[in-house]
Amino acid sequence: MDSDKIVFKVHNQLVSVKPEVITDQYEYKYPAIGNQKKPSITLGKAPDLNKAYKSILSGMNAAKLDPDDVCSYLAAAMELFEGVCPDDWASYGILIAKKGDKITPTTLVDIIRTDVEGNWAQTGGQDLTRDPTTAEHASLVGLLLCLYRLSKIVGQNTGNYKTNVADRMEQIFETAPFVKVVEHHTLMTTHKMCANWSTIPNFRFLAGTYDMFFSRIEHLYSAIRVGTVVTAYEDCSGLVSFTGFIKQINLTAREAILYFFHKNFEEEIKRMFEPGQETAVPHSYFIHFRSLGLSGKSPYSSNAVGHVFNLIHFVGCYMGQIRSLNATVISSCAPHEMSVLGGYLGEEFFGKGTFERRFFRDEKELQDYELAEATKTDLALADDGTVNSDDEDFFSGETRSPEAVYTRIMMNGGRLKKSHIRRYVSVSSNHQARPNSFAEFLNKTYSGDQR
């Protein structure tokens, strides 16, 4: 008998079918570079840098920027930011630079130029007659790259948040070593003219390149990174959340995963830790894989590892973390089951730190302490472990073990305890819940279930 088939009757006729569902039609692409070639883009003909500066500044003042010209200028301006490589720099087998080499952002990537001329129109404001200084170039580059960060701020941020961010970034590029090149609020006005800079592949690529360079190279103009920092680990919220989670509960990745009691974690954990990726390598191309075009569909995003993401943020909610309460629930990834597991794990790791003495007045005090601790361990091993079951949580050294937590969940029928529900309701009801957030989910799901 075929175990994949089901049998039933239609009009007294026996029917046998094999149920099949649509599979994910988009394959996740891992960012590892196999061809030993640096990430690359193609742009128009390289402009005269000073002419390009005047055109772009004019366009910014008139809120009429040409994205192709902006990208061409940003790529050309990279030559102004020379720094010294502090160590041999390699990623995915590609030697980027050797220790002591003088490099610019263009060293990291391959920018191919065609013979197509840019527009370089003077669209507004007074023409600049003199050639700009390096500081003026740096200020304009910084302001242009700020458009990337502004376009990444989503609509759910209310009030004047985006305007305030724009104003603060503008102030950076009015202060030494930068110089003021535009009037106040020009950045926000320019952003409103085109709010989708982060969706322009070449602009995103250049923002990621600048960020990768300034994150490693000490430079006078490193503050340019204020606009590009959001390209680091972009579309990587699942992996980033997991990293923050293990630091928070003070476990290794291996130890934390032992608590993931659900079959749907299997594929996601396999996906997150695919061999051959440089997830833990500092200054790797991996960090900017999305902006550098190395992955079309990230295997590390919250949607790619939705069960892991949901669990982590339910634990975060239990601990009262604002970031988790505000995060968006991945509704297709068993949020009810994840909230149950999150309640038990939150209880285990919330307010129950691992405390021990680590610092001593002198070596003798350290030796005395270690001897006393060894004696305690010997006594514990000699104990037959027979304690009243009601007091087990207070006496057992294994209360936090994955086995013990799993047993407690099973003994409670896979349901939350009253104390879990009270905690969830407490943290979510006192929070201004955003639509589809974890706070809203907990409020709607458990506020009427305080048994």
Curated annotation (Swiss-Prot):
UniProt-recorded Gene Ontology molecular function terms: RNA binding
Subcellular location: Virion; Host cytoplasm
GO CC, alphabetical: helical viral capsid; host cell cytoplasm; ribonucleoprotein complex; viral nucleocapsid
Record PTM text: Phosphorylated by host CK2. Unphosphorylated protein N seems to have a better affinity for leader viral promoter encapsidation. Phosphorylation of protein N in ribonucleocapsid may stabilize the interaction with protein P, thereby playing an important role in viral transcription/replication.
Signal peptide: none
Pfam families: Rhabdo_ncap
Superkingdom in the source lineage: Viruses
Keywords: Capsid protein, Helical capsid protein, Host cytoplasm, Phosphoprotein, Ribonucleoprotein, RNA-binding, Superantigen, Viral nucleoprotein, Virion
Stated role: Encapsidates the genome in a ratio of one protein N per nine ribonucleotides, protecting it from nucleases. If expressed without protein P it binds non-specifically RNA and therefore can bind it's own mRNA. Interaction with protein P abolishes any non-specific RNA binding, and prevents phosphorylation. The soluble N-P complex encapsidates specifically the genomic RNA, with protein N protecting the genome like a pearl necklace. The encapsidated genomic RNA is termed the nucleocapsid (NC) and serves as template for viral transcription and replication.
Oligomer status and interactors: Homomultimerizes to form the nucleocapsid. Binds to viral genomic RNA. In nucleocapsid, binds protein P and thereby positions the polymerase on the template. Protein P acts as a chaperone on free protein N to prevent it from aggregation before encapsidating genomic RNA.
Sequence similarity: Belongs to the lyssavirus nucleocapsid protein family.
Additional comment: Displays a superantigen activity in human and mouse, activating mostly V-beta-8 subtypes of T-cell receptor.
Name of the protein described by the UniProt record: Nucleoprotein
The organism of origin for this protein: Aravan virus (ARAV)
